[in-house]
């Protein structure tokens, strides 16, 4: 993944065009995905790689977004959401241990090498309270092939490994909205994995006790 690919105005404009298409509003394309995210009950969420804020809107703004694309951050703010670049977030009131109930990475990990995804989650893992959630959502085969900025295909096994290596042992995983076989044909079929930080966990995964 390069900054030229996802870091500029063109990528932000592409997200706006995709997410605000009139036919998608008419058909209610986001309704099942909104329902799915809400039923996970993430609480106050840190949305890492928030884009223009689709999932923050699904959560009724109950969270904070971070994105490396400043153009996306500006669009999210214009939609009434709280969003920052990583540098801005580091100086914000939200950058505090245990402040969040969950970290969400939705359609982010496939843009990174596995090790980079692990590093990204570790960077923010201390901000999640004990027993808080890590929610990972990634496209299946058809969705992965639909975007040239995708780098690594992330199936449930890889997502489970990422969650385990970042201090959020996997709790459940599933295919959504259709069974696993549909992912080879349906662009919007997703892998969903939920990990949970153990009670009393204070240190960051990978740090010595």
At which residue positions do the language-model features occur?
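Conserved beta-strand signature within the Rossmann-like core of class I S-adenosyl-L-methionine
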Residues: 131-139
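Short catalytic micro-motifs in class I SAM-dependent methyltransferases
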Residues: 107-111
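Short proline/glycine-enriched turn/loop segments at secondary-structure junctions
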Residues: 162, 180-185
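Acceptor-substrate binding/catalytic loop of class I
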Residues: 143-158
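Short hydrophobic/aromatic beta-strand or adjacent loop that forms the aromatic wall/cage
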Residues: 151, 187-194
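A short glycine-rich, Lys/Arg-flanked "PGG" loop and its adjoining helix->strand segment in the class I
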Residues: 118-130
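Conserved S-adenosyl-L-methionine
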Residues: 168-179
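Conserved N-terminal segment of class I S-adenosyl-L-methionine
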Residues: 1-104, 116-121, 174, 189-192, ...
């Amino acid at each position: 993944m390069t900054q030229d690919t996802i870091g500029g105005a063109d990528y932000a404009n592409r997200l706006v065009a995709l997410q605000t298409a009139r036919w998608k509003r008419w058909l209610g394309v986001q309704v099942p995905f909104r329902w799915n995210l809400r039923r996970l009950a993430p609480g106050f969420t840190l949305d890492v790689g928030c884009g223009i804020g689709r999932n923050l809107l699904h959560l009724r703004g109950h969270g904070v977004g971070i994105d490396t694309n400043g153009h996306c951050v500006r669009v999210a703010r214009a939609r009434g959401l709280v969003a920052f670049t990583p540098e801005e977030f580091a100086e914000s009131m939200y950058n505090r241990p245990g402040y969040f109930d969950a970290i969400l990475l939705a359609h982010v990990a496939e843009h990174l090498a596995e090790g980079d995804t692990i590093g990204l989650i570790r960077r923010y893992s201390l901000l999640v309270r004990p027993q808080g959630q890590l929610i990972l959502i990634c496209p299946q085969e058809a969705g992965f092939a639909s975007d040239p900025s995708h780098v690594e295909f992330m199936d449930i096994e890889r997502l489970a490994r990422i969650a385990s290596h970042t201090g959020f042992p996997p709790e459940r995983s599933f295919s959504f909205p259709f069974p696993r076989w549909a992912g080879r044909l349906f662009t919007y079929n997703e892998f969903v994995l939920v990990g949970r930080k153990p009670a009393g966990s204070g240190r960051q995964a990978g740090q010595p006790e």
